[in-house]
């Protein structure tokens, strides 16, 4: 499995993500082959324990911009009960949040505000882009709308739809939890390599490609 290694470089030159540099590397667990069995297993167990705590206690920092935010907060009702995934604690401060949900249309004047709030979040942190407007600008192909929040933020999970249903938001949480469980982050600022290994997430479109092609009886528009 290929992993994406993200290095923090404050002095690096990168137009898109000034504080990060990403590259595709091999599985970091292969490095344990050249080390002692005891230390390799111990470090692996520590990573699994830390990731278990992170993925089951995700506190969202909501940044609602339009109608997608209404669908997001619907998942907090008793019908959907997002508390099952440990992500029901909405934070009003970015310093107390684990991931940011950009739900809705991002205007050019709002982009610096979102980026500054993202920079105020403590590591580790993740970003979910919710809705067509946040993903690619949606139907607003105009100078005043940013054509996708990934123009200035590193997005981890994209949620398609206009607007997406609350079930789509909860599925994005599950995908994010699965990705966090496979991450390899520094256990300390003096222990191990100071980089973040993230498994490359396959899109749901590609993952279900065979299932989509195998469908012969398509549903009518009234049944969708």
UniProtKB/Swiss-Prot annotation:
Q: What does this protein do?
A: NDH-1 shuttles electrons from NADH, via FMN and iron-sulfur (Fe-S) centers, to quinones in the respiratory chain. The immediate electron acceptor for the enzyme in this species is believed to be ubiquinone. Couples the redox reaction to proton translocation (for every two electrons transferred, four hydrogen ions are translocated across the cytoplasmic membrane), and thus conserves the redox energy in a proton gradient.
The name of this protein is NADH-quinone oxidoreductase subunit B
> What is the name of the gene encoding this protein?
nuoB
Q: Name one GO biological process term.
A: electron transport coupled proton transport
Subunit info? NDH-1 is composed of 13 different subunits. Subunits NuoB, CD, E, F, and G constitute the peripheral sector of the complex.
- Return the InterPro entries for the record: NADH_UbQ_OxRdtase-like_20kDa, NADH_UQ_OxRdtase_20Kd_su
Cite the EC number. 7.1.1.-
Subcellular localization(s) per the UniProt record:
Cell inner membrane
Originating organism: Pectobacterium atrosepticum (strain SCRI 1043 / ATCC BAA-672)
Recorded GO cellular component terms are: plasma membrane; respiratory chain complex I
Q: Which cofactor does it need?
A: [4Fe-4S] cluster
């Amino acid at each position: 499995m290929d992993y994406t290694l993200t290095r923090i470089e404050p002095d690096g030159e990168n137009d898109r993500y000034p504080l990060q540099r990403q590259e595709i590397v091999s599985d970091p667990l292969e490095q344990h082959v050249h080390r002692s069995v005891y230390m390799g297993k111990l470090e692996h167990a520590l990573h699994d324990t830390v990731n278990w705590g992170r993925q089951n206690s995700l506190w969202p920092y909501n940044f609602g911009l339009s109608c997608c935010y209404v669908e997001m907060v619907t998942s907090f009702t008793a019908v959907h009960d997002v508390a099952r995934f440990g992500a029901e604690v909405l934070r009003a401060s970015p310093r107390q949040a684990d991931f940011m949900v950009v739900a809705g249309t991002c205007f050019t004047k709002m982009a610096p505000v979102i980026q500054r709030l993202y920079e105020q979040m403590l590591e580790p942190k993740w970003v979910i882009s919710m809705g067509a407007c946040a993903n690619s600008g949606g139907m607003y192909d105009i100078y005043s709308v940013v054509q996708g929040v990934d123009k200035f933020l590193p997005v981890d999970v994209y949620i398609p739809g206009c607007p997406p249903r609350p079930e789509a938001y909860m599925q994005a949480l599950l995908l994010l939890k699965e990705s966090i469980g496979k991450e390899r982050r520094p256990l300390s600022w003096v222990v191990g390599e100071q980089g973040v290994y993230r498994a490359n997430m396959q899109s749901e479109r590609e993952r279900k490609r065979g299932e989509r092609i195998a469908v012969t009886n398509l549903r009518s528009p009234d049944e969708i």
